Design a protein with these regions (language model features):
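Short, small-residue-biased leader/transition segments that mark boundaries at the very start
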Residues: 1-6, 180-183, 187
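Conserved thiamine diphosphate
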Residues: 7-53
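Thiamine diphosphate
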Residues: 11, 63-179
Length: 187
């Protein structure tokens, strides 16, 4: 049979405030897979994977990306994106930005600007899948750059980004002098 897929969006009549991002709470649900695409091809691929898998998937759709030219992408036929596989959106050696959803596009612009203005080569990791999480991709990037910035729209306190920053700070201490920072749209 097909997997259970629950989509959460609010294109019309959705929330006005960032405090209504609830991925931090959703990631505590046992057995749930939670995805949040940033681009159209990933949305199509993750949706296909969700429908073809057993168990249930919470599919978070950032409504700001619905008509976004930046999020547009050619979607190959029968394209699937595996759960728990992050995508390096931009290679870099000076800073790792770990992000997902709407903030991926913002981070790509910031990375480009930092390179133009200061020569910094910023790596942007789009995690795409919150649960399961591609810890290996995150750790490899942070190991390479020794600096991490987690950017998300959820709340700072108890938001999913806080968990990412804590994980990075705890699990990368053996190979870097890292101090992880987190920023969100809701302070």
């Amino acid at each position: 049979g097909l997997g259970d897929v629950y989509k959460r969006q609010g294109y019309i009549g959705g929330g006005l405030y960032h405090s209504q991002n609830i991925e931090g709470a959703l990631t505590t649900l046992p057995g749930a897979r939670i995805v949040c695409p940033s681009f159209a091809d990933d949305a199509a691929g993750l949706l296909r994977t969700s429908m073809r898998s057993k168990g249930f998937t919470l599919f978070l759709e950032p409504k700001a990306l619905y008509n976004s030219v930046e999020a547009a992408a050619v979607v190959p036929e029968d394209f699937e994106v595996p759960f728990g596989k992050a995508r390096i959106r931009r290679e870099g050696t000076d800073l790792s930005i770990i992000t997902y959803g709407n903030t991926t596009h913002f981070c790509l612009h910031v990375a480009e600007q930092l390179e133009k203005e200061s020569g910094w080569k910023v790596e942007v990791i789009d995690i795409r899948s919150l649960i399961p999480l591609d810890k290996e991709a995150i750790f490899e990037s942070v190991k390479k750059t020794s600096k991490a910035l987690v950017v998300h729209e959820d709340k700072v306190f108890s938001g999913f980004g806080a968990e990412l920053a804590a994980m990075i700070g705890t699990d990368t201490v053996s190979y870097t002098h890292l101090r992880a920072h987190e920023t969100s749209a809701h302070l």
